[in-house]
């Protein structure tokens, strides 16, 4: 019987990539629930307001009309309570993102994250990553692990959106009081949808990336990146994902984050 060689380093990388993918999925769920809660509450709030107006205007109306309006108000209240229980309660664990800011060297974080993305997905997808990294030995005071998760999610999303043979570019700069990372890729809807290709994110997350959205809303799979940036007092933006488009994802955080 031939023994299968064990590579502890490779196993550790796979475990870390799986952990980062699970974190991204957790924040994707949070974003989906938040969007559903908002979109369901808006019409219910309008209905509740109009029901109140009608109750005031029909205060002396036939009792059957008053009972009907009371029933409408009760139904609306029940729907709001259902949203609280089903959509809002599960978001408690991610609603407040605490960070632990400590000083660390930036370059090792970038090197480790790039190596992880290449190992876990890019090499298998035949997608190359060109990186432009800051010179010298810059350092940050931030939550290293959360930034690693955000950068991994940005890069992995770009690889997911890229066809075989394409190139993802990554640039990181430390300019004065701010550190910024930019990931650029060409979007292929076919690559996102192809079940034969290796993927880090599930089919729902990949389909949602291509959905039309308000300019202020991020793709759900990138919700973790936005939350990490905001928790550090920074910003996260990206252009719309559309087949054939060139998209840049940008994350910027202060070099001295509080926390």
Each predicted region: which residue ranges?
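Glycine-rich ATP-binding loops of the HATPase_c
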Residues: 233-239
